[in-house]
Amino acid sequence: MNFYSPPTLMELARQCLLRDEYLAISALKDLPNMMFPVMFKEAFIDGHTKILTAMIPVWPFPYLSVGTMLKNLNLDTLKAVLEEIDILISKPVFSSRCKLREITLSHDLVVVWAGSHEVEGLPEFMEQEKPVENSPGYGTKNKLKVTTELQFMEGHLDECSTYLLQWAYQREDSIHLHCRKLKIYGLTKAAVIEMFKIVHAEYIEDLELSCLCLEYLDFLNPYLKQMSNLLSLTLDEIIYTLNIDDYRNLNEEKVITVISHLPTFHHLQELYVHGVIFIECLRCLKKPLEVLSFTDCDLSQSDLDYLPYCLNIFELRSLHLTDVRLSNLLLEPLGFLLERVRHTLKSLQLMSCEMGETHFNALLPALSQCYQLTVVNFYGNELSLLFLKKLLHHTAKLSQLADELYPAPQECYDNRDVVLSHRLENFCSELLDILRAIREPKKVTFGTIKCSKCGGSYVYDLETQCCFFEKNPPWA
């Protein structure tokens, strides 16, 4: 039975104000602080532009995040927000109520704004931390900080990003543009040079480089050296060269030379590598990584042998290998690596790595010692029912596991690789019993190989305890 919960007095007051634009704007000077965040969000969603922009000059908290509401950002909305910022910074003296120091325009960067949960936590956001000398932002305390993210697609910014950069450049005496996340998918050198005249590289914390050739990576190197506070780096499909003739003459030594010239990132915590010769990238790191992710990389035996001795990965929290062919390699070094990170590792993903029972046998002794693991993903590898039982006897001892993904047993397929769903249901029920005998599993899923036509998979999970077809499984 559903019970109707009447709106609170605060909700009624907010609804009343939003229905009367003039009343809402005139009431802002006396509006309780706790009403600002929710009222701002509702005004934004309902398109009350005048109310929205009138709130910015009297915003009573240090932070204002509009990025989470700008999923479909258009130029008109951006201009409306920036026009009110212009009004704010043009005033010789800010409103006594205005505490605004930072506006966040990033889509996926969540900045908590005080008052978002009624009055809880207000004091901690009402105080400004004193800037530390030589730290990012020092010397800019009198400027309004505008935080954003930028994305280059084939050498071009979208119209909103272009407008924002031009706007910030014209107001550099009063606005500090802070780009925390930068994505570059292909580039033109001229555009990058112009961008870095406005964007301060030392404030970039998250960098994604995709579909670039090595010569462009070499061109970016001076800017990379300025990224002294980089926390996350993604290298995706860094190709050797755009010139076919150069490609014929290119050897591995030249590739290694370029990559080895990458700067030392002293604060890097996360490295994501897709389709790149990655071992040389690890030599560019100073601070121990927390996340190491390889996707679609060619891994040699010498690469694998080197990993356990890499000093930068002994504090790993996440180790993810996806579509990395391991079938022709000896995995004892990977087992040695797991043993060395057993006290810190929380997430282990070995997905679609062409691993068989021999490969997993090399890892089981070390895997059994990784007691901090909360997530394991072994989907996409070929394992028999008998071996899956052996594997689950080991993972059953890992009491912290909260999310487990395993491949369906090979006995669930006929000789044409057609899934026999009744077998999947029977076998997976047996496998779950192994876990239940030792601990109470939280989330366990078994999945078949994805269909070559639709990309779907048959799934058996702990929640439903039945076999069903999922057209777009999140892991496939």
UniProtKB/Swiss-Prot annotation:
Origin superkingdom: Eukaryota
Stored InterPro entries: LRR_dom_sf, PRAME, PRAME_domain
Entry comment describing in which tissues the protein is expressed: Expressed in ovary, specifically in oocytes. Detected in follicles with two layers of granulosa cells, and are present in early as well as large antral follicles.
Mapped LRR repeat ranges: 97-121, 176-200, 201-226, 227-264, 265-285, 286-317, 342-369, 370-394
UniProt keyword list: Leucine-rich repeat, Repeat
GO BP terms, alphabetized: negative regulation of apoptotic process; negative regulation of cell differentiation; negative regulation of DNA-templated transcription; positive regulation of cell population proliferation
Family designation: Belongs to the PRAME family.
Protein name listed in UniProt: Oogenesin-2
Source organism phylogeny: Eukaryota, Metazoa, Chordata, Craniata, Vertebrata
Name of the gene encoding the protein in the UniProt record: Oog2
